[in-house]
């Protein structure tokens, strides 16, 4: 079964006759099976979090099987170390997940699989969850297209469509920009003196967006040139606003120009 198609091609832009500049273009489209979304809520101010961060980094991102994201929360910053990757809006998302019927409260480190509290960061349980999800038919068609322009900017085109119009009613669409291979040298707080390494860190988060009356969603994001050359990519996912269930998710690593 073809789950994900991803294409990276070099595109030549011809300017002023004899001058040519190059841009990199990447694209991805979702397939017939549901790809699970695994979220980690973590903080550099939490002494229990580094093992969870390391475990998440060890997950090979096979975009046809699982999509990991790490949301750094800021409610531990008061202990003495401000996590530079944290945002208050990620706290809000974690609380919303708790309200869906997950753990019922927020804590770190917390893993969330498809909108539900996921305990037990062991490979066997994760593989079981992946296999279960791959048996579920996708309820949304997603696409991501990223073009690195000649000036270094990245144009990210996103689109979503519900497989069945009935699924569009409570469908919330989110777009995340993530970055890998991040390193921090912690100088205060519970992890003082430690070097922490992170992957799949959410640097920007957009949404919720909705599917229109024609069962369509599309939006274009223009990313600044500093995103070019980073170990980064984008994720789009559709979540039921009433239950927290993930209808489909899709990841794309940027092709650098």
Predicted feature locations:
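Positively charged n-region of N-terminal signal peptides that target proteins for export
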Residues: 1-6
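Bacterial N-terminal signal peptides
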Residues: 7-19
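Short, conserved sequence motifs used for protein processing/export or organelle targeting and
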Residues: 84-104, 110, 114-257
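Active-site-proximal cofactor/substrate-binding loop regions of enzyme domains
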Residues: 22-107
């Amino acid at each position: 079964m073809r789950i994900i198609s991803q294409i990276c091609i070099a595109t030549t832009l011809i300017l002023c006759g004899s001058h040519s500049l190059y841009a990199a273009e990447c694209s991805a489209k979702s397939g017939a099976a549901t790809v699970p979304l695994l979220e980690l809520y973590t903080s550099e101010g939490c002494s229990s979090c580094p093992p969870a961060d390391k475990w998440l980094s060890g997950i090979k991102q096979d975009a046809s099987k699982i999509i990991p994201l790490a949301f750094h929360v800021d409610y531990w910053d008061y202990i003495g170390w401000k996590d530079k990757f944290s945002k208050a809006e990620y706290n809000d998302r974690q609380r919303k997940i708790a309200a869906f019927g997950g753990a019922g409260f927020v804590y770190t480190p917390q893993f969330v699989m498809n909108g539900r509290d996921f305990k037990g960061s062991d490979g066997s349980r994760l593989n079981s969850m992946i296999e279960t999800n791959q048996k579920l038919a996708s309820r949304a068609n997603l696409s991501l297209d990223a073009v690195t322009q000649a000036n270094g900017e990245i144009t990210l085109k996103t689109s979503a469509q519900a497989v069945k119009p009935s699924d569009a009613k409570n469908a919330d669409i989110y777009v995340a920009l993530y970055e890998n291979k991040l390193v921090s040298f912690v100088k205060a707080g519970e992890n003082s003196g430690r070097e922490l390494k992170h992957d799949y860190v959410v640097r920007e988060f957009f949404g919720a967006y909705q599917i229109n009356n024609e069962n369509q969603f599309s939006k274009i994001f223009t990313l600044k040139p500093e995103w070019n050359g980073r170990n980064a990519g984008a994720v789009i996912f559709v979540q039921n606003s009433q239950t927290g269930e993930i209808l489909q998710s899709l990841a794309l690593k940027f092709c650098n120009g």
